[in-house]
C-alpha cells in the first residue's frame, strides 16, 4: 500500500512539473520614448501569424515618457513579437523579443521604414 501511495505522489509531482513547463507567466515593461502618443500596442507569440488584440484597450494610450507593463499569461515561450502604432499611424515593430530577459524602450529610430 505504501508503495502505491509513493507512486501516486511521484506521478502527481511529475504531472505538475510538466504542466509548469507547458505554460508560463511573463511580463514586459514598454517605455515610450518616441515623442508621440502610442495608440495601439499588440503583443503576439512569435509563432503566430496574426497580431493579438490591442493590449492598451479601448481607452488606453501610452503617452511619451510613460511605461506600460504588459502581463502575458499561459504562453509556452517568452518569445513575442511586439508592434506599437502612434497617433500618426507610424509603426514600431520588434520581432522575437525575449520578455524574460528584456524590457523594451521604443525610440524614434525604431520606427518601421515602410
In which residue ranges do the predicted regions lie?
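Short acidic/proline- and small/hydrophobic-mixed sequence motifs that coincide with surface turns
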Residues: 36-40, 92
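Extracellular beta-sheet/turn segments enriched in Thr/Pro/Gly and aliphatic residues
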Residues: 90-114
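N-terminal signal peptide c-region/cleavage motif recognized by signal peptidases
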Residues: 17-18
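A short, solvent-exposed beta-strand micro-motif common in secreted/extracellular proteins
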Residues: 77-87
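Boundary at the C-terminal end of the N-terminal hydrophobic targeting segment
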Residues: 21-25
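Intrinsically disordered, low-complexity Pro/Gly/Ser/Thr-rich segments with frequent PxxP/GP/PP motifs
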Residues: 51-76
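Asparagine-centered strand-capping/turn motif at beta-strand->loop junctions
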Residues: 30-35
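Bacterial N-terminal signal peptides that target proteins for export
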Residues: 1-9
